């Protein structure tokens, strides 16, 4: 299962949902700009 918006993630390890990216600053999934 992919991680949704604002779900905690580890950059380069966890998979965020399509059109989302793991923020290395906040350590959560956010929308790609």
Curated annotation (Swiss-Prot):
Keywords, in A-Z order: Amidation, Disulfide bond, Ion channel impairing toxin, Knottin, Neurotoxin, Potassium channel impairing toxin, Secreted, Toxin, Voltage-gated potassium channel impairing toxin, Voltage-gated sodium channel impairing toxin
Family: Belongs to the neurotoxin 10 (Hwtx-1) family. 11 (haplotoxin-2) subfamily.
General function of this protein: Spider venom neurotoxin that blocks voltage-gated sodium channel Nav1.3/SCN3A in human (IC(50)=80 nM) and rat (IC(50)=160 nM). Partially inhibits human Kv11.1/KCNH2/ERG (25% at 175 uM).
Tissue-wise expression: Expressed by the venom gland.
Residues recorded with modification Isoleucine amide: 33
Compartment annotation: Secreted
Notes concerning its domains: The presence of a 'disulfide through disulfide knot' structurally defines this protein as a knottin.
Annotated disulfide bonds: 2-17, 9-22, 16-29
GO cellular-component term (any): extracellular region
Primary location: secreted
Other information: Negative results: has no effect on human and rat Nav1.8/SCN10A.
Entries under PROSITE patterns matching the protein: HWTX_1 (PS60021)
Organism: Cyriopagopus lividus
Protein's UniProt name: Beta/kappa-theraphotoxin-Hlv1a
InterPro entries (UniProt xref): Huwentoxin-1, Huwentoxin_CS1
Protein biosynthesis found in the keyword field: no
Gene Ontology molecular function, alphabetical: ion channel inhibitor activity; potassium channel regulator activity; sodium channel regulator activity; toxin activity
Positions of transmembrane segments: none
């Amino acid at each position: 299962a992919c991680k949704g918006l604002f779900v905690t993630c580890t950059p380069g390890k966890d998979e965020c949902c399509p059109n989302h990216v793991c923020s290395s600053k906040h350590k959560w999934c956010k929308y790609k700009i």
